[in-house]
């Protein structure tokens, strides 16, 4: 059997050499391995996933204990930033059995990282990387640390790799020197051979070239050609799908430039500025769904104030669409109507009638910026002292489309889950939330959320292990919010009073100060809630809940990165701290959190969590009105595991926070993406948002 496999593998390896008499050098694709890194079969190369790429890989045939085992691997991978890839992996032999009885002895959840060292040596063909597999946790089934280098040749599509690893895998894979070769004779075919520190392996990989599938999606499959390990019972193979989370929309100056129809529509829109009136501008803004529209002038500058409730992925989109419409309607005639004498315009973006950002620019300069004929260095963003400035404006129109008593009905899936536990690979309680958010007076709103259970696994059913965590059919939240901003110190505050978590009545206050640039933010959250009943459903005395949390956030929009430190008393009464690093892929936020907290008279407990927050609503929602129905702009999916302990017992509630869908950061400050630096970094997105809007207007 082994000899037959060797002959077949050798023939397969030699065949591509005869496909052509000359080799054309091309970039060798970076593909997944059967372990938690990009690479060959069991060994890595020094490449990494591209920034913003999400990949899912299903694999069978893993090195565990003293053999290659018939195990399933479910791997989720991210290109966090240039050079760094992160992996979360579930390894299991069984999906539903209780491991306290029998599930094949393994059900493992782990995290892994690989970092490609920045190329400071000046040789593009040579790369180095460092990595760690199965980081932290209490049971490190596949723990491996490694360093690897690879070299790509110019004369042929070949990449050689060599490295050294320290591994706790009993089979010995990557515990010592390892190396391999990747050969890509065709744009869709790759063949690899490796020495994994114990045996030789070879695989063939088929993949879709870039641009073959829509939205730049790529797919790949890998199958074992040969292995020196005993694989009679289980061959090694994997299948993967990769999706880029970052498009050219937010930062590309060439976005839609090659669309002749769009450019013609843009030219037509910009010609309106010469003859347009103030009433035409107001009508255009109202027709696009903007509310609280008002026009005036201040210091010979035309002023437009409005509120965006339609573009909910990012307030920059609403700002960009509004600026595009204004620049196409605010010509000399319109400026003269409001008493202005220059072609400067300042747009104030409101949130529930409260100003949150202004942008000031020369309108002709901005028109050239939109059509791509020139850059515009005249765009100025301001986030401080906006209310005081608005009070000085000489308004020439009444407020149009106030939006008072209008409501948003926001639908969102909800899930409580347990991942890769002894009770199953994935246990869940699935529900649908419907959140009615009604605008009242300036800064005030009523917020009511209902939870409707839809489905649950057996362990969330009655008498199941997670029974107490299953969703119930209830009004889960009913609150009155009031936002205000303190003058002079420019501290924003929102007070919320009412019902949370179905059974608790009380109040919550959140305060935040932003630096003008937005690089620094300091927040304080205080809350106190009482249970509506003296005893819970199990007959135990209920406890009051309170939080007292201080937060510091550092933002680097040029890196699409934020760091947050939170410390204090959490919802369940435990005291400690959280450290979170967040990376933004356009409007998708991927975060990793380390937390350490303790209850009174207990030891500290450490956890690591990974979360993904993504918009589940269209880029351009339905137009606001008496009732606007939309999806959740920041749906949160997260997984947590214990670290720093010899055991990994299930734990619930430590580090728990009072999460509010309608928190101040989400409703007023663009999910924390705020400050002049952030808006300055996203000027191209302003332009592209308007162009994207125009594509919706083309018949």
Regions inferred by a protein language model and the residue ranges of each:
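Bacterial N-terminal signal peptides
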Residues: 11-20
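Feature captures outer-membrane beta-barrel proteins of Gram-negative bacteria and organelles
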Residues: 47, 72-83, 106-121, 130, ...
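Transmembrane beta-strand segments that form the barrel wall of outer-membrane beta-barrel proteins
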Residues: 52-63, 84-94, 98, 125-136, ...
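Flexible, glycine-rich linker and terminal segments associated
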Residues: 27-32, 37-39, 188, 192, ...
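Bacterial N-terminal signal peptides that target proteins for export
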Residues: 2-11
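Outer-membrane beta-barrel translocator domains and adjoining extracellular loop/strand segments
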Residues: 67-69, 98-103, 141-143, 171-176, ...
């Amino acid at each position: 059997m082994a000899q037959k496999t060797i002959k077949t593998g050798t023939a397969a390896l030699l065949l591509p050499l005869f496909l052509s008499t000359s080799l054309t050098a091309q970039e060798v694709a970076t593909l997944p391995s059967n372990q938690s890194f990009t690479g060959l079969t069991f060994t890595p190369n020094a490449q990494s996933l591209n920034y913003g790429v999400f990949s899912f890989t299903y694999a069978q045939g893993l090195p565990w204990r003293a053999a290659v085992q018939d195990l399933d691997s479910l791997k989720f991978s991210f290109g966090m930033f240039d050079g760094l890839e992160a992996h979360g992996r579930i390894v299991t032999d069984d999906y539903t059995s209780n491991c306290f009885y029998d599930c094949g002895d393994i059900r493992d959840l782990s995290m892994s990282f690989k970092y490609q060292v920045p190329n400071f040596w000046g040789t593009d063909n040579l790369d180095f990387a460092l990595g760690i597999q199965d980081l932290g946790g209490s049971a490190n089934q596949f723990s491996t640390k490694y360093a690897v280098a690879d070299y790509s040749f110019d004369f042929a599509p070949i990449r050689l790799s060599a490295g050294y690893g320290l591994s706790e895998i009993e089979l010995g894979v990557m515990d010592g020197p390892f190396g391999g070769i990747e050969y890509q004779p065709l744009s869709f075919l790759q063949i690899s051979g490796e020495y994994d520190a114990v045996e030789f392996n070879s695989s063939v990989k088929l993949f879709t070239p870039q641009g073959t599938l829509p939205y730049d999606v790529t797919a790949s499959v890998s199958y074992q050609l040969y292995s020196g390990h005993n694989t009679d019972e289980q061959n090694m193979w994997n299948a993967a799908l990769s999706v880029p989370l970052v498009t050219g929309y937010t930062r590309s100056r060439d976005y839609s430039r090659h669309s002749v129809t769009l450019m013609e529509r843009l030219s037509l829109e910009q010609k309106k500025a010469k003859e347009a009136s103030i009433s035409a501008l107001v009508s255009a803004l109202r027709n696009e769904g903007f509310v609280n529209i008002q026009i005036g002038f201040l210091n010979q500058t035309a002023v437009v104030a409005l509120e965006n409730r339609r573009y909910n992925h990012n307030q920059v989109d609403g700002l960009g669409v509004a600026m595009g419409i204004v620049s196409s309607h605010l010509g000399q005639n319109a400026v003269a109507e409001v008493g202005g004498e220059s072609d400067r315009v300042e747009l104030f973006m409101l949130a529930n009638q409260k100003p949150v950002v202004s942008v000031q620019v020369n309108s002709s300069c901005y028109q050239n910026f939109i059509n791509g004929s020139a850059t515009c260095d005249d765009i100025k963003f301001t986030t401080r002292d906006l209310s005081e400035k608005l009070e000085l404006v000489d308004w020439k129109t009444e407020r149009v489309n106030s939006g008072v008593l209008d409501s948003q009905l926001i639908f969102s899936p909800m899930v409580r889950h347990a991942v890769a536990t002894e009770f199953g690979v994935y246990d869940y309680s699935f529900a649908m939330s419907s959140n009615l958010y009604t605008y009242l007076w300036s800064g005030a709103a009523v917020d009511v959320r209902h939870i409707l259970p839809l489905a649950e696994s057996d362990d969330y059913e009655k008498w199941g292990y997670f029974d107490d965590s299953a969703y119930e059919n209830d009004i889960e939240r009913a609150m009155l919010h009031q936002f205000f901003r303190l003058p002079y110190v420019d501290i924003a505050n929102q007070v919320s009073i009412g019902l949370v978590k179905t059974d608790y009545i009380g109040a919550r206050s959140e305060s935040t100060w932003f630096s003008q640039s937005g690089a620094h933010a300091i927040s304080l959250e205080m809350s106190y809630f009482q249970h509506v009943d003296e005893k819970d459903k199990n007959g135990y005395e209920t406890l009051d809940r309170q939080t007292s949390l201080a937060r510091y956030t550092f933002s680097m929009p040029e890196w699409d990165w934020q760091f947050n430190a939170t410390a204090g008393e959490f919802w369940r009464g435990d005291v400690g701290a959280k450290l979170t690093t967040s990376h933004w892929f356009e409007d998708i936020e991927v975060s990793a959190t380390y937390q350490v907290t303790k209850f009174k008279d207990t030891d500290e407990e450490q956890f690591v969590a990974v979360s993904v927050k993504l918009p589940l609503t269209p880029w351009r929602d339905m137009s606001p009105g008496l009732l606007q129905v939309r999806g959740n702009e920041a749906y949160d999916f997260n997984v947590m595991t214990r670290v720093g302990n010899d055991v990994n017992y299930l734990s619930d509630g430590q580090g728990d926070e009072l999460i509010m869908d309608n928190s101040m950061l989400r409703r007023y400050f663009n999910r924390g993406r705020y400050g002049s630096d952030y808006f300055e970094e996203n000027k191209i997105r302003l332009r592209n948002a308007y162009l994207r809007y125009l594509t919706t207007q083309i018949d």
